[in-house]
Amino acid sequence: YSVRNNLTEITYSNIVDAYEKITIGLPSSVENRGDDVIELVAYHEAGHTLLALLFSEFFDVKRVTINANKGGAGGYTLFTTKEKYQSLPTKKYLLANLIVALGGRAAEVVLYENYQSSIPSNYDNSEVFYNITDLDITTGASADLQQANSIARQYVAQFGFDMIGLYDSSSSSKPFLGRDMAMGGDKMSDDTKKIIDCKVTELVEYAYNTAYEII
């Protein structure tokens, strides 16, 4: 980027641009999205940004955009973890990271709650979807949900940050007879996995509810 712009030195902006290109993709040269989609993307990224700024002790927000790119992203929030927490993540850092990851979904819910309450409709479909909430939420947060579940599973099963104790599920890939006997065989292992799954679900729900309340 510095050579392309005829610069004599590499600037911080050049580094950020190169990092974006590698991790996120090239910006799209065509904008054919409707205003409603752009508004949704703006809310989504604002959710991530607001929470990342709230947890400024852990994160530095580098760039926020609602411009689409060729990698398929409608927009993105680029932030980095401060050096201290890159090498030694704390329990609080992981929880903050989890909340930030779900900020986009929480912001979408807030947007459509406001949208639905402000626009009357002559069509009542409540009987069709009577037991389903947040019907206008999009699939745009799918990558965020994957990230959140990954963080939550590490929190519970790898780092021992939950009530189940200092159990590392990764050790299950290296079985030995003494451990199998101590854990009660396959039945105990299955029970432990169920406990981990429940704890992960609880943690993700906690993070989402916290993100929603803040936004």
Where are these regions (language model features)?
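C-terminal helical "lid" of AAA+/P-loop NTPase domains
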Residues: Y1-R4, V16
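Short loop/turn hinge sites at secondary-structure boundaries
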Residues: N5-N6, E113
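Active-site scaffold of zinc-dependent metalloenzymes
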Residues: N14-N32
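Soluble catalytic regions of large protease machineries
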Residues: P27-S29, V37-Y43, T49-I215
